[in-house]
Design a protein with these regions (language model features):
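Inter-helical loop and helix-membrane interface segments of multi-pass membrane transporters/permeases
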Residues: 43-57, 98-101, 159-183, 222-265
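Flexible hinge motifs at transmembrane-helix junctions and intramembrane kinks/re-entrant loops
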Residues: 2, 189-245, 409
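Membrane-interfacial loop-to-helix junctions in multi-pass transporters
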Residues: 17-23, 48-64, 92-101, 180-188, ...
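Core transmembrane alpha-helical segments of multi-pass membrane transporters/permeases
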Residues: 16-43, 56, 60, 232-296, ...
Length: 409
């Protein structure tokens, strides 16, 4: 039996490591959401969000907030798992359709993911095309800034159409939250700690684990009444508290309030709630690996490359290749790497700067991955935000307008 080339083995090993990290991150995102719920962190985000954010500007504010967090962390996944969850909750409380809020969160998260020098896909696209990272980011702004500007304008209009009078009374929601939880700005120490760790380039998994554990500690300090309620007693022992926290991390919990909207919002599935997404990602990993191993992905790109007999068709073929691989291989990393390698020579032959290719890869591979339900990114965001891809697809304007923008440019 012939031994596979060393490069193939190392590539497979690297891909395997990436997927392992993704699966563990998914598990601990579920755990984090659980401890942040019983500690009052997510309820506090919802509480202050309802007090501060005007309903008319809530949707564009979602984009701006998520953009800032995503640029700082370099991760659309982290953005969804932290402020994204809270913003969807605030939107539900305001009566704004979850699809709209989900689309705004996704738009902001991927704007930052594209332009952040900390982003894995930004670094990957630059590395594959042999482009300086900051020159790559500069080229990205040519299409990304117009795309996010159009998206913001649309969401400003949607915001005023959705809440035309701006007189929404949230007093009953605020009272229901404050009656159930001990709300304090001190609770924001935990998400701030997680964001600082990620900005300081702490591995995301470690940041999530620490965020989960500190969230559990805060639940014991600030929300003992919630621990007592979930344990079924009035004065929980150390063992009872431990069981409640472990159940929160691993399984489903529901915190009952006197408000139906909040009852639906203040429930999490823990690690167990992420299992469907994890199984989908595993299936994606296997399918994408098989497609790559049999040469199907390269065949798709080669077929499109033959059609590219003009400069416009070359850009269009690159976009089509990225979209096709995102759909067939269900993974943005494979889409970037395979398309980047296949079209590198064609761009060079036409005397096109490699920055054009790196930008096109990001405009078509990175952002569209969230729009495909069976893609690892689409499955992740849908699961974390509790909003299906079908619901937020039409509102994720930034994501589906970006490929067209790169062709227009």
């Amino acid at each position: 039996i012939r031994r596979p080339p060393r490069s193939t083995l190392s590539s497979s090993s690297a891909a395997s490591d990436v997927y392992k990290r993704q699966l563990l991150i998914l598990l601990f995102v579920g755990a984090l959401a659980g401890t942040w719920m019983i500690s009052g962190i997510i309820p506090a985000m919802v509480y202050y969000g309802l007090k501060i954010l005007d309903p008319n500007i809530f949707l564009p504010a979602c984009i701006i907030i998520c953009s800032i967090i995503s640029v700082a962390t370099g991760s659309s996944w982290t953005t969804s798992a932290t402020v994204g969850i809270a913003l969807v909750g605030i939107g539900k409380a305001l009566g704004i359709p979850a699809g709209m809020v989900g689309g705004a969160v996704i738009a902001g998260a991927y704007f930052g993911d594209k332009l952040s020098p900390l982003s894995d896909t930004t670094n990957l696209a630059a590395a594959v095309t042999k482009v300086d990272l900051f020159k790559h980011i500069k080229y990205l702004t040519y299409t990304t800034i117009p795309s996010i500007s159009i998206t913001l304008i649309v969401f400003i209009i949607l915001g005023f159409l959705q809440v035309s009078d701006g007189t929404t009374d949230n007093t009953y929601l605020l009272n229901a939250i404050s009656e159930k939880f001990n709300i304090s700005l001190v609770l924001f120490i935990v998400p701030l700690l997680v964001l600082i760790m990620i900005v300081k380039k702490t591995p995301p998994l470690i940041a999530l684990v620490i965020g989960t554990l500190v969230g559990a500690l805060f639940s014991l300090i600030f929300q003992p009444q919630i621990i007592n309620e979930l344990s079924g007693g009035t004065n929980s022992s150390i063992v009872d508290s431990y069981i409640v926290i472990m159940n929160t991390i691993t399984g489903e919990i529901n915190i009952e309030t006197n408000n139906v909207i909040l009852n639906d919002l203040f429930s999490t599935g823990g690690m167990l709630g992420m299992m469907n997404t994890i199984f989908l990602v595993i299936g994606t990993m296997v399918f994408g690996g098989v497609m790559d191993a049999i040469g199907a992905l390269k065949t798709i790109s080669k077929a499109l490359l033959k059609w590219a007999d003009t400069t416009f068709k070359l850009f269009a073929s690159t976009v089509a290749s990225c979209l096709a691989l995102n759909v067939s291989a269900s993974d943005q990393y494979l889409s970037i790497v395979v398309s980047g390698k296949m079209f590198e020579k064609a761009f060079k032959d036409r005397d096109l700067a490699p920055e054009n290719l790196s930008r096109t890869l990001e405009d078509s591979a990175t952002v569209t991955s969230a729009l495909i339900p069976w893609n690892s990114c689409g499955a992740y965001h849908s699961s974390v935000l509790g909003v299906s891809v079908g619901e937020f697809f039409i509102y994720a304007i930034f994501n589906w307008i970006s490929p067209f923008m790169t062709l227009l440019y």
